[in-house]
Amino acid sequence: MKAKELRELDNAALNEKLAEARQELFNLRFQHATAQLENTQRLSDVKKDIAKILTVQREKELGA
């Protein structure tokens, strides 16, 4: 997910993407804890996606 793509979305869509990403992170953490997760890189990718979404939301709040 690229920041440029996120900047084109409205606030409602960003909130939806954020909720989906947080749910996915929650599920990945459980899989990791029970040794069912094969691709551990996905954990960092989802965390970075969440950070990108929050950054874009903050930019919109500040009117940048």
From Swiss-Prot:
Pfam families: Ribosomal_L29. It comes from the Bacteria. Belongs to the universal ribosomal protein uL29 family. Transmembrane segments: none annotated. GO terms for cellular component: cytosolic large ribosomal subunit. The lineage of its organism: Bacteria, Pseudomonadati, Thermodesulfobacteriota, Desulfovibrionia, Desulfovibrionales. InterPro entries: Ribosomal_protein_uL29 (IPR050063), Ribosomal_uL29 (IPR001854), Ribosomal_uL29_CS (IPR018254), Ribosomal_uL29_sf (IPR036049). One of its GO terms (molecular function) is structural constituent of ribosome. GO terms for biological process: translation. Keywords: Ribonucleoprotein, Ribosomal protein. This is Large ribosomal subunit protein uL29.
